[in-house]
């Protein structure tokens, strides 16, 4: 394809590949640990950091990452207290980030051309610095999961049991909250704040239809995410529509197709089982 000759499209493919690895690993923990709502709260809270970055003239991604990590820590700390419900803590930081972001953007003079890309994403605008961020974060995440897979997996499935085994549950939860926040912010250029949480959940949901094994879910999520990105990028180029939204739409279609296939498999299996029992 002629489109592959362009540097911006090559960057988009590389960015999609790195993001698929990153979201495949972190997203599996999110889905297994049932942290989708918390991750959604952190995603929207990161807008506060973007607003502060735009207002102060600093790097919006760096500001968003710091704000997202602090928000994640805040949710984790407040939800561990008996006098605050987890969903209430999430809602508070969710709205805090959005309100701070809106106020800062309103107070910033002049036109802000990068703001729509943070809200809705544009993978075709990924630059070298974005690829470096994704690459470094991907390497860090792979290293963390390579050396600490067993305790992370234990906390993901049953934190109470992990605590009874004298594992550092609190430290692991804060470590994972940091990686979740950094992954969300690093993915903003891909699909934006509005759709970022989808990259961390939909491929994992699709993988979970066919396996419950943690490692298999990670690898399947990476492959599915990469396929979704390639198809979405090509479709957005052909149809001349936003790439981020197209990638998410494709991932949802893949999930629905997989769900249908799985349902048909179960139906055929039950039918064959019933016929064998009659014999």
Where are these regions (language model features)?
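Hydrophobic alpha-helical transmembrane segments
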Residues: 13-18, 61-66, 91-92, 131-136, ...
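Cytosolic-side transmembrane-helix boundaries in multi-pass membrane proteins
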Residues: 241-248, 252-279
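Transmembrane helix-bundle core of multi-pass membrane transporters
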Residues: 6-11, 82, 90-150
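Membrane-interfacial amphipathic/re-entrant helices at transmembrane-helix boundaries
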Residues: 1-21
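Helix-loop-helix "hairpin" substructures at the membrane interface of multi-pass membrane proteins
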Residues: 130-202
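Transmembrane alpha-helical segments in multi-pass inner-membrane proteins
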Residues: 194-245
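Short loop segments and helix-boundary regions at transmembrane helix junctions
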Residues: 28-111, 207-219, 236-239, 263-264
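Alpha-helical transmembrane segments in multi-pass membrane proteins
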Residues: 15-24, 45, 49, 53, ...
């Amino acid at each position: 394809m002629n489109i592959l000759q362009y540097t911006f499209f090559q960057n988009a493919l590389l960015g999609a590949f790195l993001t698929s690895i990153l979201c495949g690993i972190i997203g599996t923990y999110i889905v297994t640990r049932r942290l989708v709502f918390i991750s959604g709260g952190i995603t929207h809270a990161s807008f506060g950091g973007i607003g502060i970055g735009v207002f102060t003239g600093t790097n919006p991604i760096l500001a968003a990452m710091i704000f997202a990590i602090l928000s994640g820590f805040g949710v984790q700390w407040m939800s561990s207290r008996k006098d605050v419900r987890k969903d209430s803590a999430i809602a508070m930081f969710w709205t805090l980030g959005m309100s701070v972001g809106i106020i800062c953007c309103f107070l910033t003079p002049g036109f802000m051309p990068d703001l729509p890309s943070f809200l809705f994403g544009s993978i075709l605008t990924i630059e070298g610095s974005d690829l470096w961020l994704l690459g470094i974060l991907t390497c860090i995440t792979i290293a963390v999961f390579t050396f600490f897979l067993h305790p992370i997996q234990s906390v993901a499935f049953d934190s109470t049991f992990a605590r009874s085994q004298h594992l550092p549950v609190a430290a692991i939860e804060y470590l994972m909250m940091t990686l979740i926040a950094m992954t969300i912010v690093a993915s903003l250029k891909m699909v934006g704040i509005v759709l970022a949480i989808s990259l961390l959940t939909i491929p994992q949901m699709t993988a979970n239809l066919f396996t419950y094994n943690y490692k298999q879910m990670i690898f399947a999520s990476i492959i599915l995410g990469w396929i979704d990105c390639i198809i979405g990028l090509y479709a957005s180029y052909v149809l001349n529509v936003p790439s981020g939204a197209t990638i998410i739409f494709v991932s949802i279609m893949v999930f629905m197709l997989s769900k249908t296939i799985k349902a048909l498999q179960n139906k055929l299996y039950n039918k064959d089982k019933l016929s064998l029992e009659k014999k």
